[in-house]
């Protein structure tokens, strides 16, 4: 009998929960409007619900009236933006994920020590923009092995590397291997800068791939970690679709006869997962459902001190 295999863990991580709660509690405490720099997390469903409650999402701090409260998103911001907020008299509340903050701190520390930092990630992603702002003259962003091969440094230069927290572990490992081959002296943090939730969701998906021939990744197309989940499946030869609404679960699935895997990005609400699951069961009524637990998660991040 065909079955749906639900990955666990999936969906919201501790950093996303903290960021969403930061906006919700701020609205409860101070009322609307509360301004938020960038989407608080990369998921349209989450952003739309918070907008209905009174959050105003902006990209330019000039859009925020003086002396208003502004929340920085989970992805982090460059120091220059914090300075701009202070200069404009804004009351800033920081919802940056603690694991992103850890990368910022490491970059700042090693830049002060004279190291050049190789930052592995998508250079246009808001997280990378924020990290790069810590030491723009001492950071080089690389997205792939070809860019590693084009780096101008010598085997004597002091080099340190970190990664975007939401990268594919597969891709990051390949890039790191290329870096170490060229620069044996390069080093990083004692623990990976790819966050625990990214590692767990990718690990949970890899765990079920031998049992399925099709995967739905429930997540927003703007979500880095959701896109990386899709790539994890495709890299291992399993067809994967990134969907963010049950309407995107289509009769295409009827072309496949094997088991179906379902996972969700770290910014995806569980009610969206369940809605997509119901649509799938409508299309294929005799599917059974099995949960595949990869690891338990119990990480909790405290809300910002202002709340």
Swiss-Prot record:
Record gene name = ispH
Q: Which residues bind isopentenyl diphosphate?
A: 42, 75, 125, 223-225, 267
The Enzyme Commission number assigned here is 1.17.7.4
Share an example GO biological-process annotation for this protein. Answer: isopentenyl diphosphate biosynthetic process, methylerythritol 4-phosphate pathway
The organism encoding this protein is Chlamydia trachomatis serovar L2b (strain UCH-1/proctitis)
Write out the residues that bind [4Fe-4S] cluster.
Answer: 13, 97, 195
**Catalytic activity annotated for this protein?**
isopentenyl diphosphate + 2 oxidized [2Fe-2S]-[ferredoxin] + H2O = (2E)-4-hydroxy-3-methylbut-2-enyl diphosphate + 2 reduced [2Fe-2S]-[ferredoxin] + 2 H(+); dimethylallyl diphosphate + 2 oxidized [2Fe-2S]-[ferredoxin] + H2O = (2E)-4-hydroxy-3-methylbut-2-enyl diphosphate + 2 reduced [2Fe-2S]-[ferredoxin] + 2 H(+)
Gene Ontology MF terms: 4 iron, 4 sulfur cluster binding; 4-hydroxy-3-methylbut-2-enyl diphosphate reductase activity; metal ion binding
Q: Kindly identify the residues recorded as the active site.
A: 127
Pfam families assigned: LYTB (PF02401)
Cofactor binding note of this UniProt entry? Binds 1 [4Fe-4S] cluster per subunit.
Enzyme class, one word?
oxidoreductase
Put simply, this protein is called 4-hydroxy-3-methylbut-2-enyl diphosphate reductase
Report the pathway entry: Isoprenoid biosynthesis; dimethylallyl diphosphate biosynthesis; dimethylallyl diphosphate from (2E)-4-hydroxy-3-methylbutenyl diphosphate: step 1/1; Isoprenoid biosynthesis; isopentenyl diphosphate biosynthesis via DXP pathway; isopentenyl diphosphate from 1-deoxy-D-xylulose 5-phosphate: step 6/6
State its cofactor: [4Fe-4S] cluster
User: What superkingdom does the record give?
Assistant: Bacteria
Q: Where does dimethylallyl diphosphate bind?
A: 42, 75, 125, 223-225, 267
Annotated signal peptide: none
Where is (2E)-4-hydroxy-3-methylbut-2-enyl diphosphate annotated to bind? Answer: 42, 75, 125, 165, 223-225, 267
UniProt keywords, alphabetically? 4Fe-4S, Iron, Iron-sulfur, Isoprene biosynthesis, Metal-binding, Oxidoreductase
Q: Which family does it belong to?
A: Belongs to the IspH family.
What the protein does comes down to: Catalyzes the conversion of 1-hydroxy-2-methyl-2-(E)-butenyl 4-diphosphate (HMBPP) into a mixture of isopentenyl diphosphate (IPP) and dimethylallyl diphosphate (DMAPP). Acts in the terminal step of the DOXP/MEP pathway for isoprenoid precursor biosynthesis.
